[in-house]
Amino acid sequence: MAFLPPNLKIMFNPRHPPPFLPPPPPSNLPPYTGLRDYLSIFTDPSNEEPFKKEHIENLEEKREKKRKLKISENDERISKSLKAWDPYSNSETTGDPYKTIFVSRISYKTTQQKLEFEFGQFGPIKSLFLVKDSNNPEKHTGYAFIEFERERDMKAAYKQADGMKIDDRRIVVDIERGRVIKNWKPRKFGGGLGNTRAGGVDVNQTFSGREMSESREKEKEREKEKEKEKERMEKMKKRDGGLSSNGNRSNGISSGSGGSGGDRGDRGDRDRGDRGDRSDRSDRDRERGRGDRDHRGSGGERERERDQRDRGGDRGGDRGDRSDRGRSDRGDRGDRSDRGRDDRERGRDDRGDRGRDDRRGGSDRDRDRGSRDDRGDRDDRSDRGRDDRRGGSDRDHRIDERRRDQRDYGSISDAHFDHFQYQPQQHHHHQQNHQSHHNQPHPERVNRDYSMISNENGF
């Protein structure tokens, strides 16, 4: 407390002592007495009447009672008026009811002349009766009766005028049912066909037209029939023990669906298997391409020995076409500038030996090689890769032909590879055979327009 600031010490100061008050004076009230003297005033309990329980109406019950009373009074009034109503004795009605139409929902701005103008397009009008308000004769009640001279005009107006707009309001056209249909009651007596004042917002009709209201009523009837049919089916299922049968049926359906799913799974496995086969074939093609490159890289000595044997066969004169190929290969290694033309000529010789079975692939490969000679061995390998990827029987046929050529006398690309890789070791062969190679005739070199190369398109 000693260390507190002055403003906080004030809060701990003692309060002032309470003021002194004198003691209250003594009371002069009478003492408490018993009730014995007052028993004669109370009645005897045995002589009391039993309690009568009375029901007090609340606000909702009062409103319901008032509404029912009003409905009953209105029904009594309608029943009395309906007994006195006779449509045939009305002097203001039209003549022939079968030529008369009933028009309702007319705008209060519409006049009788406007109605005659609008309905006069269907045919000549005999009479038009626009019903007036009994309280105010200057205004009409919104409906009228129109009689045509011919019945066909009435039918045309009945079909075409329903839903027509007059003064920005759609009207409803119907036949006169008071004198045509037996036991018909008009709207003022609790009858009629309209649903605009049937009840609440969810019940009242909010659209115009006779056909639309009829279709809506038919839809409601169909919905009710569907609900009744559903209830009938549920009762039959409960009576016949449909729960267990439904369970069995559901199990059967589920098993059937599972079987179909299994079939789809089998088809999916077959599809995946086909894709796997295609991937295996693509892997084999890639391995074959690598094997060809390894063969070209590692078998240079064997190719060189084969070239030597081919040159020996040339001197003996017993190898035929392969000796010509050997001489052309040696000439190719001797003259680099003529390598592209020699390759194309050698390709044509190969096609001639094979009977031109693979004319399309060979011609494409020769044209690609002729245009890409300067790119070296890489373009040759890419051409072979593209040819391998074409797939099908043509690809397998070309692979078999290429294998036989490599086994017999080497491929064209191998000759290129040997030329670039082993050129220093074979330089003396070029010098020995250079003169003999240039002395050989080249009958196809004059055909520089590729007239001997053809394919399926005729190019």
Swiss-Prot record:
Residue ranges with Low complexity bias: 242-254
Transmembrane segments: none
Compartments, record wording: Nucleus
Span list, region Disordered: 185-459
A biological-process GO annotation: mRNA splicing, via spliceosome
Basic residues biased stretches: 426-440
InterPro entries to which the protein is assigned, alphabetical: Nucleotide-bd_a/b_plait_sf (IPR012677), RBD_domain_sf (IPR035979), RRM_dom (IPR000504), snRNP70_RRM (IPR034143), U1_U11-U12_snRNP_70-35kDa (IPR051183), U1snRNP70_N (IPR022023)
Keywords, alphabetical: Coiled coil, mRNA processing, Nucleus, Ribonucleoprotein, RNA-binding
Compositional bias annotation for Basic and acidic residues: 211-241, 263-408
Gene Ontology CC annotation, any one: U1 snRNP
GO molecular function: mRNA binding; RNA binding; U1 snRNA binding
Location of the RRM domain: 99-178
Protein name (database record): U1 small nuclear ribonucleoprotein 70 kDa
Species name: Dictyostelium discoideum (Social amoeba)
Gene (UniProt): snrnp70
